[in-house]
C-alpha cells in the first residue's frame, strides 16, 4: 500500500473486509483507484480470489455460496468506483504497474513483486496481511517438486524430492533461490525471514491454503476463472456466476 495515499485520506491500513472497502473508497480520487488486483483469465485470478472464498469460512465444496459472497464483495468494489473493471484483464504485473505509477493506492500481490517495488516505486510503501472476513486466509504458491511417471531414475528422483522438501533441503533451496518455505518448522529461520516486508508474508503461513484439489484441479481453476470474468465484467451476477461454476467444480472435487 502507498503510505502517503492512506495518510492523505486519513485512513489506517485495512484489516478486514469492511475496512478494506472503506479505505479503497476513501483513497479513490479521479483516475486513481483504491485497489488493484489481477483477475485476468489465468491461474493468477484463481490465486487471488480463493483467499476471499476461504475468508468467508467456506471452500470449493460450497462455492455456490462462498464463491458468490467473495465475487459479490469484489464486484462491489467495482460498482462503487474503488476498483477498475479493467482488473478483469490485469495480470499481476499490470496490478503492480498500476500501483507503482500511482494509479492505485493498494494492490493484492505476492512477495515476488517486492524487488521490483524496491527498485521502481518512487514513494514510501509497505506490506500488510490480507484483510479477513470470518477468518484469515491466503493462498500458498511457489514451486512444486514432482517425480514424473516413467522417470528412468525414479528411485533417485524420489530421494531428491524427499530431500528438497525436508527441513534441511528446503532451507538450502529457499536461501539459495530467494524464496520462503511452506514448512512451519522453517518459519523465522530463513535468510528472508529477517526482511520486515517479507516477514509479513511468512507470518501468514499458519493460515495459508494450498490449492490441493486433486487431479482435476486445472478444470476446477478454469471454472473459477470464468466465474470471476462473468461477475467482475457484469456479464452475470456474482450469485449466478458462482452457481454455474459450482456445477462444474463439485463433481470434480476429490
Task: Mark where each language-model region is.
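C-terminal lobe and pocket-closing loops
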Residues: 110-124, 131-226
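Glycine-centered hinge/linker elements that transmit conformational signals in sensory
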Residues: 23-28, 60-88
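Periplasmic solute-binding protein
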Residues: 1-13, 38-60, 140-146, 220-229
Amino acid at each position: 500500500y502507498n503510505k502517503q495515499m492512506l495518510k492523505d485520506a486519513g485512513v489506517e491500513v485495512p484489516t478486514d473486509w469492511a475496512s478494506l472497502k472503506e479505505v479503497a473508497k476513501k483513497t479513490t480520487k479521479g483516475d486513481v483507484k483504491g485497489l488493484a488486483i489481477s483477475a485476468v483469465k489465468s491461474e493468477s485470478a484463481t490465486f487471488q480470489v480463493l483467499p476471499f472464498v476461504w475468508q468467508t469460512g467456506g471452500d470449493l465444496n460450497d462455492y455456490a455460496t462462498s464463491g458468490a459472497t467473495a465475487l459479490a464483495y469484489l464486484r462491489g468494489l467495482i460498482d462503487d468506483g474503488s476498483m477498475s473493471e479493467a482488473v478483469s484483464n490485469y495480470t499481476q504485473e499490470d496490478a503492480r504497474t498500476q500501483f507503482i505509477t500511482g494509479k492505485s493506492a493498494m494492490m493484492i500481490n505476492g512477495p515476488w513483486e517486492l524487488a521490483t517495488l524496491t527498485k521502481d516505486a518512487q514513494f514510501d510503501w509497505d506490506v500488510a496481511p490480507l484483510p479477513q472476513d470470518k477468518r484469515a486466509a491466503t493462498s500458498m504458491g511457489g514451486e512444486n517438486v514432482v517425480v514424473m511417471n516413467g522417470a528412468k531414475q525414479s528411485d533417485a528422483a524420489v530421494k531428491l524430492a524427499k530431500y528438497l522438501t525436508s527441513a534441511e533441503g528446503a532451507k538450502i533451496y529457499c536461501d539459495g533461490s530467494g524464496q520462503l518455505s511452506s514448512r512451519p518448522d522453517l518459519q523465522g529461520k530463513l535468510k528472508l525471514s529477517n526482511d520486515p516486508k517479507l516477514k509479513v508474508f511468512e507470518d501468514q503461513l499458519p493460515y495459508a491454503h494450498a490449492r490441493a484439489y486433486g487431479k482435476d484441479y486445472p478444470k476446477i481453476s478454469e471454472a473459477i476463472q470464468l466465474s470471476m470474468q462473468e461477475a467482475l465484467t457484469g456479464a452475470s451476477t456474482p450469485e449466478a456466476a458462482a452457481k454455474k461454476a459450482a456445477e462444474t467444480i463439485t463433481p470434480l472435487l476429490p
